[in-house]
């Protein structure tokens, strides 16, 4: 952990990219009730619409500064004993009634369990088990929905680009990824750059263990007997050496479900492999909090760059809530958000200098 002097130096440098308009936007995300857009933020902050909308223009010149801020935070909270976990996952921002945006497409929405219209993005984040720090994101558009001259990229391609861009900039022990990344192409990429991983794999994938070629769900070596909850085996997927873990867990409606994890992390028991994979859940919680508390789905602008700015501001607000949670010993991000909102509302008439002790980026 850094010393107090390092904190002060870092904080002084981080102030450079936060303009007054960006500051208004972040504060508004915390105190707005209901939809969080430029109109409501300007109303609750008591400033003009233009002064809030200008934050989108300010962001264009400060995108790299924001990513550097996130990367510096990772270096502050990572230690040799716990270098952290790299996470990549996709989420959909619902836009059911929107019509004019090059980013609009139909995609499966995991929370609604159906295909909906919206904006899909792939997000990279880092966690050490105590704090979650978003790092970068990029948009995905379904091939048939592309209306401009952009080249189609699969979500796994975007994920590889994010990992490649960030792998040498931040410390992490391994990457924990969902079942969408349990394929030959992605595993080859991870092995190529000597990255450790823990990935859930669909049960219909064929693997080879002890010379037996069979699907994961039917392989005799991975069969769990009676009350057995974990089983580990060394095998191959498409010729790629992997450690394969079968894990029986509780499913919906009090049922039992067997999931499969592949990894190349040596020296762990089957249970420890399951715990290593579980480190990817913080990114799911981040998506939920960003949508429910910070209005991730509330941007009503049409241009792509405005959506990018809004998402970035939401991720910045989430990060500040995470930092406040650590600093004040809060038990959850939601409690941290309520604490910050109360502090802002109590100081609304005191001037902007009073926000300096509340946010790391101000």
Question: What is the role of each PLM region?
Answer:
Residues 39:
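Residues within the helices of the helix-turn-helix
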Residues 53-59, 305:
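Short linear loop/turn motifs
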Residues 1-10, 14-18, 22-27, 32, ...:
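Single, function-defining residue in the core of a domain
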Residues 43-55:
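Short, basic interhelical loop/turn and adjoining N-cap
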């Amino acid at each position: 952990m850094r010393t107090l002097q390092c904190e002060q130096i870092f904080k002084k440098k981080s102030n450079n990219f936060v303009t007054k308009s960006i500051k208004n936007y972040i504060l508004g995300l915390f105190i707005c009730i209901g939809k969080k857009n430029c109109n409501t933020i300007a109303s609750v902050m008591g400033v003009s619409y233009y002064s809030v909308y200008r934050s989108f223009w300010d962001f264009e010149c400060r995108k790299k500064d924001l990513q550097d801020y996130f990367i510096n935070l990772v270096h502050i909270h990572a230690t040799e004993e716990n270098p952290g976990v790299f996470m990549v996952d996709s989420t959909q921002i619902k836009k059911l009634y929107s019509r004019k945006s090059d980013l609009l497409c139909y995609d499966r929405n995991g929370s609604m369990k159906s295909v909906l219209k919206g904006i899909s993005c792939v997000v990279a984040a880092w966690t050490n088990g105590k704090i979650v720090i978003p790092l970068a994101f990029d948009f995905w558009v379904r091939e048939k929905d592309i209306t401009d001259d952009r080249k189609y990229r699969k979500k796994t391609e975007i994920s590889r680009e994010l990992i490649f861009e960030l792998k040498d900039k931040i410390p992490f022990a391994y990457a924990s990824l969902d079942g969408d990344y349990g394929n030959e192409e992605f595993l080859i990429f991870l092995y190529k750059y000597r990255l450790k991983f823990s990935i859930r794999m669909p049960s219909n994938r064929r693997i080879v263990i002890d010379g037996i070629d069979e699907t994961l769900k039917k392989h005799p070596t991975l069969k769990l007997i009676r009350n057995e909850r974990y089983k580990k085996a060394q095998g191959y997927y498409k010729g790629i050496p992997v450690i394969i873990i079968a894990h029986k867990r509780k499913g919906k409606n009090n049922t039992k479900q067997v999931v499969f994890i592949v990894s190349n992390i040596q020296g762990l028991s089957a249970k420890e492999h399951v715990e290593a994979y579980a480190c990817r859940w913080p990114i799911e919680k981040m998506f939920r909090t960003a949508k429910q508390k910070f209005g991730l789905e509330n941007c009503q602008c049409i241009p792509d760059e405005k959506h990018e700015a809004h998402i970035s501001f939401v991720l910045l607000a989430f990060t500040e809530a995470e930092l406040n949670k650590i600093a004040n010993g809060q038990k959850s991000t939601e409690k941290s958000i309520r604490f910050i909102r109360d502090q802002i509302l109590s100081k609304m008439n005191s001037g902007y200098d009073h926000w300096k002790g509340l946010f790391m980026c101000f």
